[in-house]
């Protein structure tokens, strides 16, 4: 009797295959490239590649946003605090707090957003 296996919630990436995340997106001058790996009501996993100098203006996320720098260097402002992340560094941008990003050089990151069970929290 075969066991029923549910389909993967991951997309744009092969299952059961080793990958180097920073190689899954390319930095292009004057552009921000994104590649969604998972998206549902509970979590979002996206890879980003920023050309040097590219920015995301201050905004608020609907969940806790966990950034892991994969390559390059970025300046992240959360509320009035500024942090510089390099490859291997991570930071949490808390739910509801304004945050902005500016690539100080070509930069790649993985963004994981965890959404609250009750969006009104």
Each predicted region: which residue ranges?
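A short, N-terminal "cap"/entry segment at the start of jelly-roll beta-barrel domains
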Residues: 1-42
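Conserved short histidine dyad/triad with adjacent acidic residue
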Residues: 30-31, 41-61
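Short, conserved beta-strand element in jelly-roll/cupin
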Residues: 49-51, 60-76
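A cytosolic small-molecule/anion-sensing beta-strand core signal
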Residues: 70-71, 86-87, 105
